[in-house]
Every structure is written in structure tokens, then in C-alpha cells.
């Protein structure tokens, strides 16, 4: 998001932006925010939405963790693993997979910061599910490895939402 935002304010020098980055869903009206980015299907609301892309979720862990605990071959294998969950955006106790598979998870660690989840995964504390861009550098440098790729759920839409009467 930040690179696009920097490009935008460079192109429009009279625009002033107060940017808030948080790992949770905010109420734009209550918090006085003009626009936000939402990942996933949108509930009905009074907000206007513009679809701008799509992302996918991945489950990953460190090579050291996978060497010690083994690589899960199916979603059901996750019950034998230590799981780390991000609390911010998706406070759910179930993970959905392709082919309509849903499993209940019992995370050992729940963290409200995606960056901290990445740190815990790199430290070898367990497996976690994040959005692919949140772990792209770690997947590229090999400090994290994806598992259960063939079970990844469908891509999730990305929207810019804003209050009625506001435009970007």
C-alpha cells in the first residue's frame, strides 16, 4: 500500500494524508477515517467500494520447525502442529481450505500484529496463516516455507472502501 500511496501524493502535491496502518478492521465512521483497504468479501454497508485486486492466504513455517515437526500433507494434519494465529483481521477459530474443507484450530499463540506473527514463525515456534504479501520476502529468501499449497482457498478480493460522498 505504501508505495502506491507515495506515488499518489507525489502526483498530487496539494493532497494531505494522515495514514493509519493497523492489523484490524476499523470503523471508518467512528474513527474519522475517509478511506480504507479491506481484504475479503465485504458485508453490506453504507460504504462505497472499488475492487482493486486479489490476494491469497498461505500457511507457512520455518525450515527448522518443519524439519523438527514434519510437513503437514493435509489440513487435518494441522492438529498435530503448533499453530500461531493473527488476531487482527480474522479472529476466527477455523481455517477454510479449497474443496470446502474447514478445520477448527487451537492456536498456541495468538498475536494482534502480523509482523510479530512473521517473527514467531521465523523463530520456529509453529505454523501460521497469513496473506501471501505479508510473507513474500521470507518465502523468497527461504526463511519461511509454504505448506499445504494444494489446499489454498480461493483468492480474496481487495477493495478500497470510502464513505458516501467521498472519493479518492
Regions found by a protein language model. Give the residues of each.
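C-terminal regulatory
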Residues: 27, 42-155
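Solvent-exposed beta-strand sheet faces enriched in polar/charged residues
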Residues: 18-22, 147, 161
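Conserved amphipathic alpha-helical interaction elements at protein-protein interfaces in regulatory
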Residues: 11-14, 141, 166
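Central regulatory/effector-binding core of bacterial HTH transcription factors
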Residues: 1-45
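Secondary-structure boundary/capping motif
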Residues: 1, 28, 69-70, 168
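A bilobed periplasmic-binding-protein/Venus flytrap-type ligand-binding module shared by bacterial periplasmic
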Residues: 158-168
Amino acid at each position: 500500500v505504501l508505495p502506491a500511496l507515495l506515488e499518489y501524493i507525489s502526483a498530487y502535491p496539494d493532497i494531505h494524508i494522515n495514514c493509519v496502518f493497523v492489523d484490524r478492521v476499523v470503523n471508518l465512521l467512528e474513527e474519522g477515517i475517509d478511506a480504507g483497504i479491506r481484504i475479503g468479501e465485504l458485508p453490506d454497508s453504507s460504504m462505497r467500494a472499488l475492487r482493486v485486486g486479489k490476494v491469497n492466504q498461505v500457511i507457512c513455517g520455518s525450515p527448522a520447525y518443519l524439519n523438527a515437526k514434519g510437513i503437514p500433507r493435509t489440513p487435518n494434519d494441522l492438529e498435530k502442529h503448533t499453530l500461531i494465529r493473527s488476531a487482527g483481521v480474522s479472529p476466527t477459530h477455523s481455517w477454510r481450505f479449497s474443496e470446502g474443507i474447514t478445520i477448527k484450530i487451537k492456536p498456541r499463540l495468538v498475536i494482534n500484529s502480523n509482523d510479530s506473527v512473521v517473527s514467531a514463525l521465523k523463530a520456529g515456534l509453529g505454523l501460521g496463516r497469513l496473506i501471501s504479501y505479508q510473507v513474500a520476502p521470507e518465502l523468497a529468501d527461504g526463511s519461511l516455507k509454504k505448506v499445504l499449497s494444494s489446499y489454498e482457498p480461493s483468492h480474496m478480493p481487495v477493495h478500497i472502501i470510502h464513505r458516501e460522498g467521498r472519493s479518492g
